[in-house]
Amino acid sequence: MARFFQPKKKLQPESKHQQVLVEKLDHQGAGIAYLNKKPLFIDGTLPGEEVVTQLTESKSKFARGKLIKLLKPAAERVEPFCSHFNQCGGCDMQHMDYQAQLAYKQRTLLQLMKKFSGSEILLSPPVTGLEKAYRRRARVSLMWDKKSRQLQFGFRRKQSKQIENVTQCPVLVAELECLLPELKAILSHFHHPEHLGHVELVAADNGAVITLRHTGPLLDEDVAKLRQCAEQHQATLYLMPASDQLERISGEAPYYQEIGFKVPFEPNNFIQVNQKVNQQMVVQALEWLDPQSSDRVLDLFCGLGNFSLPIASKAKSVTGVEGVDDMVQKAALNASLNQINNAQFFHANLEQDFVGQPWASEKFDKILLDPARAGASGIIEQVSALGAKRVVYVSCNPATLARDSQSLLEQGYRLTKLGMLDMFPYTSHLESMALFEK
């Protein structure tokens, strides 16, 4: 049989090891080195570090690498406090000193604002809370592994559908973290674990809340065990057989207190993850907005009334507008519960022109907006038409804040205050607040 020559396969670029110097961090917290003048992004590295990296992706304008060996650590490097760090997709900056994280996030905010809006301003002091045990809500992923016949119970890995099994989480508040091992043990013995979707955990002011999302029927005896667990921990238990269905099995309806106001909510409603930072954020928003007894204030993306209720105690009137009708109804109920009669709430698509809406026919003295990560591009150009002299923009994405600020500046507003809100310590995620004035 003839034998043909076959050259050895060349080593693919993706598998080569390279020694590089990390020069800075990108806006997602990844280290940036340069390889042949091309930026190389390496998760888990810090500026000033010499590392060995394995290329995992190589494009024409950038490359990505995996940290193989740390040759020279940065002074800001610390030992991660969670054994699941690097696997769990939650925290991505536990290897960095906390004060260094704050400085990095503030630099990121300033850089983005300057890049997109051209604005340069001194930052206000950052709003911070607890470094650990700060999360009052979390979603635990569940998946039944048919091969191993084990229930996967934990958090999604970074950029993956795989589950990192956990029974502890140091950034969860203690009353939620202590539930993890017991919930895993109970759910692992359900008769139909393939019907389990996820568990939503929330720490309300009147106790923990456990919500089980399931996609098929559950046996009464299984639900009884879960109910017993909830009652032992003085927690409220909900079942969620569909995304729009909630059934309270035991316990009280949850609520939280916000600077003197009681805010009831359901476990599938959005509330801020970090209670201490949220409280300070509301106080700062009130200080910057400075509502007077003669002011008509507009609260866009008002949710349950996190800002509307406190503003109403100081302003002549508050108009809250939200894109989710269920939240609008709950905000109105929350105002009534707190005996607030100068607030009204409306449902509207805040991605479209709203100036013609009846609630927008009145002029407003001041505006607060707190959009989702996508920002407020659909409505930001309409702000000046409402007549407000002062606008407070609360943002969970500095890139969209910077983008939207361009429009506000073009409408004649000036950026007079800017500050970072550290809602998620030990992650690269940052929130911010900006004040615009005419």
Curated annotation (Swiss-Prot):
The active site is at C396. Keywords: 4Fe-4S, Iron, Iron-sulfur, Metal-binding, Methyltransferase, rRNA processing, S-adenosyl-L-methionine, Transferase. S-adenosyl-L-methionine binds at Q272, F301, N306, E322, N349, D370. The keyword Iron applies. PROSITE patterns: SAM_MT_RNA_M5U, TRAM, TRMA_1, TRMA_2. Residues 11-69 form the TRAM domain. One of its GO terms (molecular function) is RNA binding. InterPro entries: 23S_rRNA_MeTrfase_RlmD (IPR001566), MeTrfase_TrmA_AS (IPR030390), MeTrfase_TrmA_CS (IPR030391), NA-bd_OB-fold (IPR012340), SAM-dependent_MTases_sf (IPR029063), TRAM_dom (IPR002792), U5_MeTrfase_fam (IPR010280). Belongs to the class I-like SAM-binding methyltransferase superfamily. RNA M5U methyltransferase family. RlmD subfamily. This is 23S rRNA (uracil(1939)-C(5))-methyltransferase RlmD. It comes from Vibrio vulnificus (strain YJ016). The gene is rlmD.
